[in-house]
């Protein structure tokens, strides 16, 4: 009996093919800009140069739009404890499509947000400043995260990378 049921089930095609497609069956795709390894390296090089200018050795991470690592540099003398922080900042900026840090309305992160966001995301997101989204024509193609200096120094170095992307993307 169970063999018979299986046999019958095998002949029943899935009903998904009966559902209508949106747009009268026309499937639309969109050309999306992508951050390449060469682009990530160019961003990283400029950010690293800025870190040298301000004399703060930094950990710098560049990720794609999905938060996956494309390029990373740990400058000589950068804090080892900040490696994962830089990656988390880059990932958070890319995935949230927004700079890391307190929300513009509050100005200061609440203790709940500061602790809750990393805990709720198993350490994958942060509200510490120093992560910026990388945008091309309004589309997020990745993120840059910088850590080892003060939050202001981290943001300054990350901004240098964002400016470089604007140059190479135009």
Name the predicted role of every residue range:
Residues 4-8:
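Basic polycationic patches enriched in arginine
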Residues 20-170:
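Flexible, solvent-exposed loop/hinge segments and secondary-structure transition points
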């Amino acid at each position: 009996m169970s063999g018979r049921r299986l046999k019958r089930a095998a002949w029943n095609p899935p009903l998904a093919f009966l559902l209508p497609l949106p747009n009268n069956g026309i499937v639309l795709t969109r050309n999306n800009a992508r951050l390449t390894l060469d682009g990530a390296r160019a961003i990283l090089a400029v950010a690293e140069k800025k870190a040298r200018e301000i004399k703060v050795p930094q950990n710098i991470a560049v990720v794609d739009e999905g938060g996956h690592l494309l390029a990373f540099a740990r400058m000589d003398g950068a804090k080892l404890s900040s490696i994962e922080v830089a990656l988390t900042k880059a990932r958070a900026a890319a995935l949230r499509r927004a700079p890391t840090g307190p929300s513009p309305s509050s100005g200061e992160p609440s203790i709940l947000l500061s602790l809750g966001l990393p805990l709720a995301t198993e350490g994958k997101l942060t509200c510490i400043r120093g992560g910026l989204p990388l945008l091309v024509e309004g589309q997020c193609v990745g993120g840059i995260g910088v850590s080892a200096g003060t939050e202001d120094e981290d943001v300054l170095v990350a901004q240098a990378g964002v400016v470089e992307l604007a140059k190479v993307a135009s």
